[in-house]
């Protein structure tokens, strides 16, 4: 795993953060060292997907990047009841060409081992290079968006949640993980400070933290948990709860009635 040092040197002109080839090369290390609970969120997203998958449906990984969630869901389903995932497909969608290409390589490398180790054939993963707002969604039992909505234009988020809700079958779920902010300024500052302490503990310097924060400004725009929950309920979900939180990173599950 290549170490993330993209912001280790002083940069005179810091561009907005992009998911390009440079980011792809260090992305696994970046996530591990800069997203509290990332590995747990991916693993438990797969557990949740395994619970709610319905036969002959689609599972979606929206903003799939290197396919961690899609692969985890596939592996969880391969270990479960074959009848539950019969006729299912996992669709991984990302608009970054470099991410899709790297994801395709990772899936092909991992596929043989998965096929040999499990008791029944794995659910196929289908990759799509596309914008989330433009790609059709249908016949879904599970939709996962792990740290993706925060990069969508705020004015387009409600419509996207409605599209997802409409694509889900009754009893289907959305797993939504996001960096969040808090309405109380003192609480918000506490979580930001602790998040930066977490990054320092994982080897990032103050320069790296500062420069990446500048690069993400106006690119990653977080919402509050209350805003997320209100939007999901308005979109047509019947139930919504936070199932994971560490500092200013959280994951919710929304269930369609």
Regions found by a protein language model. Give the residues of each.
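Conserved class I S-adenosyl-L-methionine
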Residues: 175-201
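Conserved alpha-helix/loop element of class I SAM-dependent methyltransferases that forms part
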Residues: 37-55
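Short alpha-helix
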Residues: 218-235
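Class I SAM-dependent methyltransferase Rossmann-like catalytic core
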Residues: 12-17, 21-41
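Core SAM-dependent methyltransferase catalytic element
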Residues: 235-257
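Class I SAM-dependent methyltransferase SAM/SAH-binding core
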Residues: 60, 65-116, 120-134
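A short glycine-rich, Lys/Arg-flanked "PGG" loop and its adjoining helix->strand segment in the class I
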Residues: 158-170
């Amino acid at each position: 795993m290549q170490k993330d040092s993209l912001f280790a040197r002083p940069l005179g002109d810091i561009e907005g953060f992009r998911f390009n080839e440079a980011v792809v090369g260090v992305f696994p290390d970046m996530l591990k060292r800069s997203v509290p609970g990332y590995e747990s969120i991916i693993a438990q997203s797969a557990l949740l997907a395994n619970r709610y998958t319905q036969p002959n449906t689609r599972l979606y990984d929206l903003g799939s990047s290197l396919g961690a969630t899609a692969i985890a869901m596939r592996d969880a389903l391969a270990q479960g009841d074959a009848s539950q995932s019969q006729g299912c497909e996992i669709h991984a969608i990302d608009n970054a060409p470099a991410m899709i290409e790297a994801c395709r390589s990772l899936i092909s490398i991992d596929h043989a081992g998965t096929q040999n180790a499990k008791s029944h054939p794995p659910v196929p993963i289908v990759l799509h290079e596309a914008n989330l707002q433009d790609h059709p969604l249908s016949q879904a039992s599970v939709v996962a968006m792990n740290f993706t909505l925060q990069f969508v234009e705020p004015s387009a988020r409600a419509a996207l949640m409605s599209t997802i809700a409409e694509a889900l079958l009754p009893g289907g779920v959305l797993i939504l993980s996001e960096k969040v902010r808090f309405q109380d300024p003192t609480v918000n500052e506490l979580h930001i400070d602790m998040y930066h302490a977490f990054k320092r503990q994982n080897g990032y310097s103050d320069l790296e933290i500062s420069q990446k924060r500048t690069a993400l400004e106006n690119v990653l725009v977080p919402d509050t948990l209350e805003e997320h929950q209100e939007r999901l309920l308005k979109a047509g979900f019947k139930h919504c709860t936070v199932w994971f939180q560490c500092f200013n990173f959280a994951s919710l599950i929304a269930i369609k009635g």
